[in-house]
Amino acid sequence: MLEKIELDNGLKIYLLPDNNKHTTYINLIVNFGGKDNEVKINGKNHTIKSGIAHFLEHLLLESNAYGDLMRIFGMRGVGSNGFTSIDRTQFYIDCVEEVENNLGILLSGIHSPIINKDVINNIRGPILEEKRRSLDSKYTSSIYNASISAILDTKNFKSILGDLSDIESIKEKDIELAFNSFYRPDNEIIVIGGRFNKDNIINVIKEVYNDIEFKNIKIEKVKVLHKKEVNKKKVKVIEDINLEKSIISFKIDTLNMLPYDKLMLDTYLYYFLKNNFGVTSTLNTNLVNRNIIIGNINYSCDLVEGYHVIRVEANTKKMNLFNDIIIDYFKNKKFIFDEEYFNLCKRNYIIDLITRSDDIYRTIDPLI
């Protein structure tokens, strides 16, 4: 049973105990992502440079009071990583032993950055290389544009990594402003699942946060009222490639849905997409046999900014025909419901729950 605890400092904690697991999963979520460029800090408007959230993620993992957190966790036999999305930055660890100690290291390390010119320049180099590699990727621009056009109404958002010029211009004051503004208990969530002692966990969290001196900053994100409709009907990107790629995006407004209903929708969408667009689906086989697509249809479903965003995409040399088929498929509800396949998916889902092989993060995400 998922339990929510909110501390006096505003920190939200979600606990999903499961003593049948040997592993404990810990995720620190900061509500600061690639889109958070327009904010009010102590009543004054500020523009945060694009790419700051991602840059800060790297810095916090590599330069803090403990040193390089991923190296330290690796020496302790603990899996660890971090990533930045449109609306969040996340740091997670998976451990079997010394849960409380590892939790303390994660929380203390992330909140004790070492920020100076040398550190920033050391972080900057690899991120510039990461950005250049992303620009060389065949479909980076088209994937990015399709995603943004479907969900975001924000003028200053460029990409999670930012432009090369943004990365090159990041200074100490930019990092310090972002860290002090967003890395605070009332803007963070801690998710813990698996095997752990609840009382010990809560005590560690309280002790760590009590020892941190947070800046007295009042921050207000500039709220964007997203339209229920897509922002742009079509985005065309010209790149020097031999093979075209089409990405068709849909969004479902789930802002006012209850957490449990979001979880159920996520589960049903997984079945729906796999059954209708998977490798063995009738539609995929038909498009491959007719040489309309190269390879197979790819699909995804993500929860972003209160919307479930569905993407159906494929490499194709007959883009207009592929687009017409997919749009007609949705518009005229030509969906296939295979009861036998649905029951098989349901049985597999139940087996995952019984054997505890389900993805704890995917289970919890719609609930928080």
Predicted regions span which residues?
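PAPS/PAP-binding and catalytic site of the sulfotransferase fold
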Residues: L103-L107, I190, I201-K206, F322-F330
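Second-shell loop/turn segments in exported
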Residues: N42-G43, L59, Q90-D94, I114, ...
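Flexible, glycine/charged-enriched surface loops at secondary-structure junctions
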Residues: N216-K223, N286, I294-S300, I336-K346
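Acidic/histidine-enriched segments that form metal/cofactor-coordinating
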Residues: N64-A178, I294, D324-D328, F337-I368
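Helix N-cap motif at beta-to-alpha junctions
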Residues: C95-V99, G194-D199, N315-N320
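His/Glu-rich zincin catalytic helix
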Residues: M1-D68, F179-N286
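Short, flexible turn/loop "capping" segments at secondary-structure junctions
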Residues: G82-S85, K158-S159, N180-D186, E239-N242, ...
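Catalytic zinc-binding patch centered on the HExxH motif and its immediate surroundings
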Residues: P17, H22, V78-I86, Y299
